[in-house]
């Protein structure tokens, strides 16, 4: 029985065979050239060919050098343009907004006892770690501002809370995280609905945190240029009261009564004191504009 592969073998096409034969003839013809004739031909054509090759190479080299010089000049011009156009300053408020937009959680406001804001912030951060709710409670902030206080003729720069009695908390609100925040010492509750508080909007939180961001950006820019920090408009407070002072209440339900100051809170601009009512001393909280020093 014959092999089908052998029977099905295809005869090579005539064109392909002739092409291969032509290529073989060329190779054989090259091999059959007389060495003396080849050498003579090389000598006859060698010098002009080498000269032409040198000229071509020289022309190519000149063109390459010219192109390289043009590229360098273009780079120099581009560099000059970049130096001539300083980078546009970054708007710190816009940068803050972009950063806040990408952060996890929502911002809530909690109410604290006056003067306990920083203590509440520290306690809350510690409790978030110890009670394993770091994945829900991310950040606590007490916005501050710099003011000038004048007391007994002495001028002093101090930082005080911008929102006395309040702390900002960035968190995911769950039953567990709500309980940790609400039961932090010094916290009296969430602002708004006590059990289902509403978060601040992006515009609201930006407005609260923007002044500090602007101050920081201005300070860093001045330091980078080796200049002093720019002067800022600050509030001036004149403190005429001291613990132990006897004052007269000028406004409110205790007007005309005498009080003795036992605590002063410059941040909230309030004092705590004792007012004698029906022969008994009663603790009260009064604002600076409700009392007058005797």
Swiss-Prot record:
PROSITE patterns per UniProt: NUSG
SUPFAM superfamilies from the UniProt entry: N-utilization substance G protein NusG, N-terminal domain (SSF82679), Translation proteins SH3-like domain (SSF50104)
Source organism of the structure: Streptomyces griseus
GO BP term, example: transcription elongation-coupled chromatin remodeling
Cellular component, GO annotation: cytosol
Superkingdom of the organism of origin: Bacteria
NCBIfam families: nusG
Keyword entries, A-Z: Transcription, Transcription antitermination, Transcription regulation, Transcription termination
Name of encoding gene: nusG
Record-stated family: Belongs to the NusG family.
Function, in words: Participates in transcription elongation, termination and antitermination.
Pfam families noted in UniProt: NusG (PF02357)
Protein name: Transcription termination/antitermination protein NusG
Disordered: annotated span: 1-91
Record-linked SMART domains: KOW, NGN
Acidic residues bias (residue ranges): 25-39, 59-85
Low complexity bias spans: 40-53
């Amino acid at each position: 029985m014959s092999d089908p592969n052998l029977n099905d073998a295809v005869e090579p096409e005539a064109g392909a065979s002739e092409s291969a034969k032509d290529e073989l003839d060329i190779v054989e013809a090259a091999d059959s050239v007389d060495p003396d004739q080849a050498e003579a031909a090389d000598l006859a054509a060698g010098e002009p060919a080498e000269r032409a090759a040198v000229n071509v190479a020289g022309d190519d080299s000149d063109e390459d050098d010219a192109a390289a010089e043009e590229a360098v000049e273009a780079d120099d011009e581009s560099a000059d343009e970049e130096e001539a156009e300083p980078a546009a300053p970054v708007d710190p408020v816009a940068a803050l907004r972009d950063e806040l937009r990408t952060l996890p959680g929502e911002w809530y406001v909690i109410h604290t006892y006056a003067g306990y804001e920083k203590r509440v912030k520290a306690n809350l951060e510690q409790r978030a770690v110890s009670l394993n709710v770091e994945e829900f409670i991310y950040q606590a902030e007490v916005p501050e501002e710099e003011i000038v206080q004048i007391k007994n003729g002495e001028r002093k720069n101090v930082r005080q809370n911008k929102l006395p009695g309040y702390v900002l908390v960035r968190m995911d609100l769950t039953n567990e995280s709500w309980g940790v925040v609400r039961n932090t010492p010094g916290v009296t509750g969430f602002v708004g609905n006590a059990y289902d508080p509403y978060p601040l909007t992006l515009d609201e939180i930006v407005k609260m945190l923007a002044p500090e961001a602007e101050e920081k950006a201005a300070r860093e820019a001045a330091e980078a240029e080796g200049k002093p920090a720019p002067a800022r408009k600050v509030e001036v407070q004149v403190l005429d009261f001291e613990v132990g002072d006897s004052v007269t209440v000028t406004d409110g339900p205790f007007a005309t009564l005498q009080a003795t100051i036992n605590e002063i809170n410059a941040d909230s601009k309030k004092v705590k004191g004792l007012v004698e009512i029906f022969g008994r001393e009663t603790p009260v909280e009064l604002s600076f504009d409700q009392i007058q020093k005797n």
